[in-house]
Amino acid sequence: MKVAIIILSLALVAAVFADQNCDIGNITSQCQMQHKNCEDANGCDTIIEECKTSMVERCQNQEFESAAGSTTLGPQ
């Protein structure tokens, strides 16, 4: 069950990045919607938080890579 949830979370992460939408409000909504049918009463909040953390980290990495890729050295 947790493996399926993780796979779905990764698919959601890819979909959000495809849109380049890293707004925390959107991330929260997407994770909550993705896991709305969670059956683990004690673990659902944790799963949603892990989803959000993963998506935020990927957004930060994407922003860092974009910034690094746009840096040029020498005359332009």
Swiss-Prot record:
Principal subcellular localization:
secreted
Tissues and organs where the protein is expressed, per its UniProt entry:
Produced by the albumen gland of the egg cordons.
Single Gene Ontology BP term? sexual reproduction
Does Glycoprotein count among this protein's keywords? yes
State the disulfide connectivity.
22-59, 31-51, 38-44
Instruction: Extract the signal peptide range.
Output: 1-18
InterPro entries to which the protein is assigned, alphabetical: Attractin, Attractin_sf
Task: Enumerate the GO terms in the molecular function aspect.
Answer: mating pheromone activity
Residues linked to a glycan: 26
Record localization? Secreted
Q: Which SUPFAM superfamilies match?
A: Mollusk pheromone (SSF90183)
Q: What is this protein called?
A: Attractin
Naming one, the record's GO cellular component terms include: extracellular region
Q: What does this protein do?
A: Water-borne pheromone that attract the marine mollusk Aplysia into breeding aggregations and coordinate male and female reproductive behavior within the aggregation.
Note the Pfam families from the entry. Attractin
Annotated keywords: Disulfide bond, Glycoprotein, Pheromone, Secreted, Signal
Assembly and partners are described as: Binds to temptin and enticin.
